[in-house]
Amino acid sequence: MSKLPGNKLAEETSPYLQQHAQNPVEWYPWGEQALTLAREQNKPILLSIGYSACHWCHVMAHESFEDASIAAVMNQHFINIKVDREERPDIDQIYQTAHSMMSQRSGGWPLTVFLTPQQTPYFTGTYFPKTARYQLPGFAELLPRVAAYFHERKDELATQSVQLAEALARTIPVANHLVSANENTIRLAFDQLEANFDYTHGGFGTAPKFPNPADITLLLHQAHDGNKPAEEMALQTLSAMAAGGIYDQIGGGFCRYSVDERWNIPHFEKMLYDNGQLLSLYADGYQLSRNKEEKAVYAQVVAETIAWMQREMLSAQGAIHSSLDADSLDVHGHSEEGAFYVWQPAEVKALLSPAEFVVASRCFGFDRAPNFESQAWHAYMAVMPEVQDQLLLQSAKAKLLEAQGLRTRPGLDDKILTSWNALAAKGLARAGIVFERSDWVVLAQKTVDFIREYLWVKNAAGNFQLMATAKGEKVHLNAYLDDHAFLLDTLITLLQASYRSVDMQFAEEIAEALLGNFEAESGGFYFTSHQHEQLIHRAKQPYDNATPSGNGIATVALQRLGHILGEARYLQSAERSLQAFDNVIKKNPAGCASLTYALQEYLNPPTLVILRGEAAKLTSWRIALKNYYPHHIFIYLDESADKLPGTLRRNLLSNVNGWICKGVVCSKAITDIPSLLTQL
């Protein structure tokens, strides 16, 4: 089918936008062409925000955007703009916040926003059915009413625009002139998490259940500091997710969230950002746990999740694709959520030996009532396998995975996002450190090398700048705060896995970009750079969501790099960030867990441990330092380490030497492992 006239999406990098390129709707990507057209024609804008793995986005597209009669109304009354929220999180953040303010409801996707030509929203919603149902108005009847409101209520819209601008401005926290949050604030964070903890099933709140990686990270850190309840909460949650259906028991990797409180039935989309963060968490949990069976489960989760990434998500260039769709074709050729992942017992029985079927049925719940829409079975760990059954279960999983591979696969969103690749690379690096897997570290390095080679580009002024996304030969969109913050954090982790001078240089360049392009005068960092296009609001977000707060991670990473290099400017910038968000952290430290951890390292700076020696001799030191040390930075410098900054420069001697540094003071050289462990 040829491209429809007026639809401008076919050349976009986003698979989500490309999915709508053949709609009868005259879609435009967000940009000056569409915005100018709205102003010139005095038409309202219909802004539709979603992403390719979103189930309800597909439903609304099929019901409304593929319908010629609906499209005709949209084209008559509106300038229609389609946005991929993964490529344009800046736009998504603004209008999700506006939707929450205007409707007093939480947002989500698809997000449907009607804007004035000046980009101010005047009516918002999420999914709208074609005809009225679910207590929602029908899209067909809604469109002309919303268009008429724009033309007939100009005075009301002007007043509403001013009120919204003022409300958005109030979301920027008022900075303090000092950091008054303290150890009591960190204890309050635990109290807030504990109050919302599900002691029966792990995790926080009720259904739907999300992994909340930033919360678990904070609990793991507090567990290391002797908080036993925090340890129990973190490990119970990790174990419950590993046993649940939110984790793909057959193919590895985690789905976005669980629709039930027991973690058993997921929303089936698989997102890179979840899996990258969870790799780090399960590696940390493995180090912290003292339970042999628990450690074995965490190790298996890490290995299987990385295998899934390599098998289904890795690009030929070494970067990692974004997501897998929740929907796929079932045996009848119908697009259904979860079709790729669910089973029928008869199908399983035909694929396995009798002994394998008995074990798999018992362990994965195939011998129980159907748990997915009352007609299919989704595997979860109903019963842990006995020791003698583990090999049978592994062989059953291998056969089921092979059979699953013959099904129609979920759609792959194959764009490369800098921020998500950074999260994945950190997870790979942490796993490589913990499990002594140099091949996983190499995967992390290749991911970062891709970012440095393809997404770190010279601009018109001849300066390097980071870009947000790539697909094929096209690299575009100025990178956001999260891209820079997550990448800097990842580079610091990689330096601990295997020191490379190119990574240290890149870390310094990204840190300078953060300070030069994102820092606010009052402290903290804007989500968009100083060179970014002007939108109706410039966000400065302290709170963690599915991904951690860019402000929190930037603050942690700048502090850590500042201590490694002895660079006061980085430490001062981090302090200004904590001052900027001081009131927010004191009021809701659990809601901004990443900033709370930054506060913890501000109050008690991390210990830098420098180890210099030949690679072969450093191995025993690495093994001895395998415990969980979240407040330490370990830098191993073998004979290949070159171009060292002054703070790390040490002579290479015949035996390994170590130094423990706090602030600007380092210990005398330590020449044996027991002495080092004693001083830690």
Residue ranges and their predicted role:
Residues G50-C57, F254, N275-L278, L428, ...:
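Extended, hydrophobic alpha-helical segments in both membrane/secreted and soluble proteins
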Residues A240-Y247, K446-V457:
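Glycine-rich, acidic and aromatic/proline-enriched surface loops and short helix-turn segments
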Residues M1-G427, A431-V434, L578-L680:
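Replace the tail clause
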Residues L220, H224, A283, Q287, ...:
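Tandem alpha-helical RNA-recognition repeat domains
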Residues N291, R311-A316, K458-A485, T490-G646:
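Long, polar/charge-rich, low-hydrophobicity segments
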